[in-house]
C-alpha cells in the first residue's frame, strides 16, 4: 500500500449535521422558554407608562430568545450529564443530532443577538439585565454551581426569576419594588418545584453525579427544606396584597393557591416511603407549575381588565 493510500484511509470525512428544525427548537428548552415569556409579559404589562406595541413585542421576543440561548448553552455544557439521565437522554446532543460545537455556536449567536437587539431597539438597562441573566444561568449555575453544591438550584434560581425584572426595565429603563416582588415569588418557588422533581428522579441525579439535595442530604432533609421554602413562598407571594402593591383579587387568589401549595408540601413531608411518597412529590411538582402560572395569570388579567375599563369607562 502506498503512503498516499495509507494517508487517505486515515482521513475523516467532515460530519454532515443531521439536525432538523425540531432539534434546534429542543435546544431552546421550549417549556422553560414559555414560562420565561409568560412571566416577562406580566412584568412588562405591570410596568407604568406607555410603551409602543412594536417595542413591547421586541422586548418579549428578545427575552424569550435570550432564555432559549441560555438553554442551548446549558445543553452544550451538560451533554455528559444529559446522556446519563433518563429524563434528558433524548435531547439533541446525546442523541447525536447536534454536536457540542454546533450547540455552542447556536447558543452564543442567539445570546448576542437578543442582548444587542434589546439594547439598540429598546434600552441598554434592559439589555444589561438580560446579559446578566444569561451569564448567571450559564456560568454561575450551569458551569459552576450545579456540579459542586446541593444549593445549586437555590442560588441558580435567581436567573429564572429575573425575566419580569428585565421586562419592567424595558418599559421604564429602571428597576423598582414591583418587579422585585415578582422576582422574589419566582425565587422562592424554584426550590420546592425542582426539589420535588429531584425526589422522584433522585436515582437519575445520583447516576449523573449531580449533587441535588436528595442525593447529598437524603430525602427526609429535602422534604423539610421543601416545606420551609413553601411556607416562605406563600408568605412572600401574599405580601404584595397587604403592602398595597397588588389588589384584593390577587391576594385572595394567592391565599387559595398558597393553601394548595402548602397542602401538597405537607403531603410530601408526611409521606416518606413507597408509592405514596412518590405520588406526593409528583403532585407537588405538577401543582407548583399550576401555582405559578395561575398566580401570574391573575396579575395579567387585572392589567387587561383595567385597560378595558379605561377604554370604555
Curated annotation (Swiss-Prot):
Catalytic activity entry: heme b + (2E,6E)-farnesyl diphosphate + H2O = Fe(II)-heme o + diphosphate
Membrane-crossing segments per the record: 35-55, 56-76, 98-118, 120-140, 153-173, 180-200, 226-246, 248-268, 292-312
Enzyme category, top tier: transferase
CDD domains linked to this entry: PT_UbiA_Cox10 (cd13957)
Bilayer topology: Multi-pass membrane protein
Keyword Cell inner membrane: yes
Stored InterPro entries: Protohaem_IX_farnesylTrfase (IPR006369), UbiA_prenyltransferase (IPR000537), UbiA_prenylTrfase_CS (IPR030470), UbiA_sf (IPR044878)
Any one annotated GO CC term: plasma membrane
UniProt family annotation: Belongs to the UbiA prenyltransferase family. Protoheme IX farnesyltransferase subfamily.
Task performed by this protein: Converts heme B (protoheme IX) to heme O by substitution of the vinyl group on carbon 2 of heme B porphyrin ring with a hydroxyethyl farnesyl side group.
Stated name of the protein: Protoheme IX farnesyltransferase
